[in-house]
Regions:
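Juxtamembrane intracellular "pre-TM" segments in multi-pass secondary transporters
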Residues: 2-14, 206-243
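Helix-loop boundary and gating motifs at the non-cytosolic
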Residues: 7-65, 237-269, 273-276
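A membrane-interface helix-boundary motif in multi-pass transporters
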Residues: 50-52, 169-192, 382-401
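Helix-to-loop junctions at the C-terminal end of transmembrane segments
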Residues: 70-84, 286-300, 384
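Structural signature of the two symmetry-related core transmembrane helices
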Residues: 87-102, 302-317
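Helix-loop junctions at membrane interfaces in 12-TM secondary transporters
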Residues: 103-116, 319-331
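Glycine-rich segments within core transmembrane alpha-helices of 12-TM secondary carriers
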Residues: 147-169, 366-376
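Multi-pass alpha-helical transporter architecture, strongest
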Residues: 193-204, 395-414
Length: 414
């Protein structure tokens, strides 16, 4: 019994690693809630329609993912080099934090989108290194549990600054400031929270798995990318998993990133949207912990398909969404499964790759994840513009989940 308890007791380094999830998740929550509202206000001031607003927001998200897709493998291979991972991780965090603050200085929609792209690329770049740190922070037998706790505490911890920011925005008039000023303060508060929660990891992390420093490191990184891609032909499990992950997680991130923009385009009440997404974070906390515990009883090959099937149902439900109460139902169900699918995918991948090449492989992982979500956002944006219906755009995401489910079953049999 004591051994079982000891197994789930986090080390100081594991706690520091999890704390970064608490910090960056605050930025993720802001991107999913208040930042689209900020952009919507600027877009309306610039004469954009609701459909154009949703489309341009989707195009900006697509631009981020294309840039991330190009940079991730390069950053990932550099990260595997001795003493490279922490400095480049620190730089990416700095880019994200500075960009988060700078968004509040934009007065028109186009500069705002450009700064948003800058900040989101920094955030996405930091995750290449953060995810690859998992193999240095803990051992394979603890990866599912630690990864799940990272997402779980990230969800609930991100609510702390968000509640403060939400109170500022909703109560701006009562404290004598404009809503735009309140949004500026929200961006600053989130940036400070992100920075402060990063410091323990920067102090404690030491790279355990690495390759030695070589001359012409950048040139060598491209050579190693080529070698890894060739090796994927031999490692069929990793190859098929990445193809499956490319599809299903693309749909997951699109739903998360565009939820507020989608609800706003449908004309739903802004306050209701924000509170519903806060509920998503609260529901996601225990749900992620539950999936972490279930991973000790059932293999990820069983749990991940359950999550994919649930998201297919979410996309289908979104196609018929018209009323505020339906958005609340959607928010709760998304919260139930988003932690499980993200955490189990990350830990499952960490267990099937060489630990000394974790940065290199997680560079590919991020291409197929956050770096590949341009497909989902493009489906939503193009579908919305062609049909004039946001429901059609979001509902079309079900294709990604069906294909992802089939490919994952193939990978699990390899």
């Amino acid at each position: 019994m004591n051994e079982a308890k000891q197994k789930f007791r986090l080390t100081g380094l594991e706690r520091a690693w999890i704390l970064y999830d608490v910090g960056n998740s605050a930025f993720v929550l802001l991107v999913a809630t208040l930042i689209p509202i900020f952009f919507n206000a600027l877009a309306e001031g610039g004469g954009l329609s609701s459909v154009e607003y949703l489309a341009y927001w989707g195009y900006a998200a697509s631009a981020v993912t294309v840039i991330t897709a190009v940079l991730s493998p390069i950053l990932g291979t550099l990260a595997d080099t001795r003493n490279f991972k922490k400095p480049i991780f620190t730089f990416c965090v700095a880019v994200g934090v500075i960009g988060c603050c700078a968004m509040g200085m934009a007065s028109t929609w186009l500069p705002f989108l450009l700064i948003f792209i800058f900040a989101k690329v920094g955030f996405s770049g930091s995750l290449v290194f953060y995810d690859s740190m998992l193999s240095d922070v803990t051992v394979p037998d603890r990866m599912d549990e630690v990864s799940s706790k990272g997402y779980a505490w990230g969800y609930i911890g991100s609510c702390v600054p968000f509640v403060v920011c939400l109170a500022l925005v909703l109560g701006a008039g009562s404290i004598g400031i404009s809503q735009m000023k309140a949004l500026n303060l929200a961006l600053f508060i989130t940036a400070v929270w992100w920075l402060v929660t990063t410091l323990p990891l920067l102090r404690q992390y030491k790279q355990v798995h690495f390759v030695e420093v070589q001359e012409h490191a950048i040139r060598q990184s491209f050579a190693r990318i080529g070698h890894t891609l060739r090796h994927l032909k031999e490692d069929r499990q990793v190859f098929w998993f990445l193809l499956a992950f490319f599809c299903y997680i693309d749909g997951v991130y699109t739903i998360i990133d565009m939820a507020t923009a989608y609800g706003t385009a449908l004309g739903l009440d802004t306050t209701g949207l924000l509170l519903a997404l806060l509920v998503t974070q609260i529901v996601a906390f225990p749900s992620a912990l539950v999936f972490g515990r279930l991973s000790g009883q059932y293999p990820s090959g069983t749990l991940i398909p359950v999550c994919i099937a649930a998201y297919a149902g979410i996309a289908l439900f979104a196609f018929f969404l018209k009323h505020q109460w339906q958005f609340w139902v959607l928010a709760v169900v998304v919260g139930m499964f988003k932690g499980g699918i993200q955490a189990l995918s990350r830990s499952n991948f960490a267990k099937i790759i060489p630990p000394e090449k974790s940065g290199e492989y997680f560079g590919l992982f991020d291409i197929c994840g956050k770096g590949a979500s341009f497909l989902g956002t493009m489906i939503v944006s193009v579908g919305s513009q062609l049909t004039g219906s946001a429901n059609v755009g979001v509902g079309s995401l079900i294709v990604l989940f069906v294909v992802g489910f089939v490919l994952f079953r193939v990978s699990d049999q390899k």
